[in-house]
From Swiss-Prot:
KW Nucleotide-binding (keyword) present: yes
One example GO MF annotation: ATP hydrolysis activity
Name of the molecule in the record: Putative replication factor C small subunit R395
Function: Part of the RFC clamp loader complex which loads the PCNA sliding clamp onto DNA.
PANTHER family: REPLICATION FACTOR C / DNA POLYMERASE III GAMMA-TAU SUBUNIT, REPLICATION FACTOR C SUBUNIT 2
Residues at which ATP binds: G45, S46, P47, G48, V49, G50, K51, T52
Organism: Acanthamoeba polyphaga mimivirus
Keywords, alphabetical: ATP-binding, DNA replication, Nucleotide-binding
Matches recorded under CDD domains: AAA, HLD_clamp_RFC
Coiled-coil ranges (or none): none
């Protein structure tokens, strides 16, 4: 195990076949690769599902050895990225390139862009789109203006499953010769909530700090409550046992976890807890309201106790 290269880069997919995507998306990408017309793309999905890696693999496949000259990547989340739109894109599109290949521009995190920026890009697509493929990645495609959506194919990436992430992490552990147990990897999957990038970063942090991967070490390095404690609180809420549920919550608070992380853990556990879908959604709504209050600076323990009371009250409505 060496610490010279971040694992998120070391284990980034190199080819399209390396990206974890479902068969339907894979077929659509293959159609895109074979399409002789200049088709533009919007790739949308949760963080860490491989959107940016997919675009880089597409560029490598289409451009080959010309990738350094024919591929431009702009991250809209950076101020530099927004300023690059008017100063870098037109010159890039105008420069002479291989006659049989289209240049490719990736606009990463495009849903962060203002409408004005997006309209500017739409005008550039109209002007340069015959010889340049524009590809957008975003978490929420509804924040991309209709003018751009109407001229793009939209690929919707699903959130990665725990099993998919677990398999990928186990391969990394074997390659890096890191001792691990299944509980440790499952805990990383739980914390990452479908985000491969976060899961690999958490794996590397734990491995470099402790040189092995176990549940307790992962929880320690990631500073999140034990999901079993959260599960116990939810179980006690289902039994209307406020006193015991609050006691466990107090024990969690004493371990100095961030209130925001405590509440977020409830959402992770509720998503997989065995209950009716209707009740699950109502309880998650209560937890989300508590998250909003905490994000506004209302961080007293009363917020957490109040949340437990509201969860119990909501559960009792079904009795």
């Amino acid at each position: 195990m060496t610490n010279s290269i971040p694992w998120i880069e070391k284990y980034r997919p190199v080819n399209i076949d390396d990206v974890i995507i479902d068969d339907n998306i894979s077929k659509q990408i293959n159609i895109f690769l074979q399409d002789r017309e200049n088709v533009h793309l919007i790739i949308t999905g949760s963080p860490g599902v491989g959107k940016t890696s997919t675009v880089r693999c597409i560029a490598k496949e289409l451009l080959g050895e010309d990738m350094s000259q024919g591929y431009l990547e702009i991250n809209a989340a950076e101020d530099r990225g927004v300023r690059s739109i008017s100063t870098i894109i037109p010159p890039f599109c105008k420069k002479v390139f291989a006659a049989n290949k289209s240049k490719i521009i990736l606009l990463d995190e495009a849903d962060i862009m203002t409408s004005k920026c997006q309209y500017d890009i739409n005008n550039m697509i109209k002007k340069f789109g015959r010889k340049t493929k524009f590809i957008f990645t975003c978490n929420d495609s509804s924040k991309i203006i209709e003018d751009i959506q109407s001229i793009c194919r939209i690929l919707r990436f699903k959130k990665l499953t725990d099993e998919q992430i677990n398999q990928y992490l186990s391969k990394i552990c074997v390659n890096e010769k890191i001792p691990y147990d299944e509980q440790g990897l499952r805990t990383i999957c739980y914390i990452s909530n479908g985000d491969m990038r976060k899961s690999i970063n958490d794996l590397q942090k734990t491995a470099f700090t402790f040189e092995k991967i176990t549940k307790n070490l992962v929880l320690k390095i990631c500073k999140v409550p034990d999901p079993e404690d959260i599960r116990k609180i939810i179980s006690l809420c289902l039994e209307s046992n406020l006193e015991k549920a609050d006691e466990i919550m107090n024990n969690i608070i004493k371990l100095d976890y961030c209130y925001f992380d405590i509440v977020t853990s409830f959402i992770y556990v509720l998503k997989v807890y065995d209950m009716s879908e209707n009740l699950r959604l109502r309880l998650i709504m209560i937890v989300n309201e508590t998250k909003i209050n905490i994000s506004k600076g209302l961080r007293s323990k009363l917020q957490l106790t109040g949340m437990i009371c509201r969860l119990i009250k909501e559960i009792q409505r079904d009795e």
